[in-house]
Amino acid sequence: MQKDDVLLRMEGICKSFPGVKALDDAQLTVRPGTVHALMGENGAGKSTLMKCLFGIYSKDAGTIWFDGKEVSFKSSRDALDNGVAMVHQELNQALKRSVMDNIWLGRYPRIKLGGAKMPFVSDKAEYDMTMEVFKDLNFEKFGININPRTIMSTMPVSRRQMVEIAKAVSFNSKIIVLDEPT
C-alpha cells in the first residue's frame, strides 16, 4: 500500500436506539501503520461506532470501506474472517479454561495422523502458538510473564486483559480495535 492509501473509511455512519441517536454522520479514516484514539464523553458513541464496524450492531446509514472494498459485517466472526479484531470493554472469557484455550477457542490446532486432521487438539501446538503470540507482543521485554496453561480465573484482571489483546493479535488482523481494554 502507498502512503496515502486508506485501510478503513467509515462515512456518514448513523445508529439509533429507542429514544437515542447514538451516531449522527460519524466519520473515521485509518491508514495502514497508524494508531488512532477516539475520545469523548461517556455516551458519545465511540463504542457504538466500533461495534458497527465489528458487526455487533448494524448501522442505520452510512458506508464502511475496508481494504478497498465496501463491507457490512454481519457478525463478529465475519469481521474476524475479514481482518478486523476487537478487544471489548467487557471481558468475554471462559474462566475455567486455560489462557491458551481462551486464545484459540474454536480454532484449536488439530492432531494430524496419516495426513488427516483428527478431532483431537494438539496441546503442544496450542502451547507453542500461544508462546509465539506472546513473543510477537514482547511480553517478556515488558515483564509480562503469563503461563499459557494458567487457568483464567486465577489471574488478575490486568493479566486477563493482556490475554484478550493476545487473542486479537492471534487473528493476524489488519486492524485491531481496543475498546478501553486497559
Describe every region a protein language model picked out:
Residues 1-182:
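Glycine-rich phosphate-binding loops of nucleotide-dependent enzymes
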